[in-house]
């Protein structure tokens, strides 16, 4: 239920389509759908987060990916090609080390540019055998009256109905009851051509595509030989609270040295 509410906000903001006007939890305050989506992914566990990236690409919203914890990934011998990932997904990918503030300026600039340009991610399609099995269902959903009623990208609507989403099926049955038998038959035909239940096949395919993408944009090698003392100083002086204390300590040390040297010279 919570996931569905989040999805509705991401898709429509407070301007819900007619099919959702009867929902009991209507928006209580005016707000727009987001101009841009910002996904923070963990570079040390990238494969897991890429599955969500594939799902977000279906929403038809500009997307920016923050590739965080890049320093820790390199220390573990994981080297991510941010440019290759950006090209494959069709979205800006910005390398960041958030706790040190590194890359945040570039990240906000990329998000602002994406919101202004309204450039959506490249369509991340299912594997060919699934696309073939879903062609009849996709043809049904291509009807203008259905697209107008739901006001969502067709690839997203196709995935929701293919995965047998309760809410989308219920709304389809309420507003287009004559279409439901066709959708049911198309799902059954698609499932007949696949080796496992359709929803399981879609989940496995998404996991497989994320794994392939991960292998394409990453390289495993020797852990980066970083100088620990430099990293310790970075963490100290870039810390939101400890940085001030460290800076004051250095300033006090400089003053002490100046006065000591002056005293020696005067003597």
Language-model regions, residue ranges each:
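Alpha-helical transmembrane helix bundles of large polytopic membrane transport and channel proteins
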Residues: 64-65, 74-223
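Conserved C-terminal guanine-recognition region of P-loop GTPase G domains, centered on the G4
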Residues: 2, 6-94
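Core alpha-helical transmembrane segments of integral membrane proteins
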Residues: 236-267
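Generic recognition of stable, solvent-exposed alpha-helical segments in well-folded globular domains
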Residues: 106, 205, 209, 228, ...
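Cytosolic juxtamembrane amphipathic/interface segments immediately preceding
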Residues: 24, 220-236
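Structural motif corresponding to the C-terminal cap of alpha-helices
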Residues: 15-18, 217-221, 237
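Short flexible coil/turn linkers enriched for glycine and charged/polar residues
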Residues: 59, 87, 152, 227, ...
